[in-house]
């Protein structure tokens, strides 16, 4: 896929659509299409939007040992659905892939990244303050540090409420 320094900046900013999943996704459980079904995420509604999945995970686990061990994660079917719907980006308040505890990622350990990034759909992970966007229309801006041939980078993410 496209590296951070090659990705058009427009992919990192645009209209957002927040999906409030608090209380609907448990620790160590995937966000599945069944979980998303009640939210009317038809392709024509989410095309070219930044989909923001809000589970409340960062608020309860950030800075703890649990943050990357017990996190909810994205099911492969959801990543494939978002790719097919041609979303602009996927933003979450957790880590999208479930990794083996206490080990750095190995080849093949990050299926969501391998599905989404080759389609030039950025993943924006571990967002905070999403409670301020519940029920509101907004634009999201999450511009990553430009790293030559990088496949990930820290970003300053901000939203403009409309």
Task: Name every feature range the model reports, one short phrase each.
Residues 1-162:
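Active-/binding-site microenvironments in catalytic and ligand-binding cores
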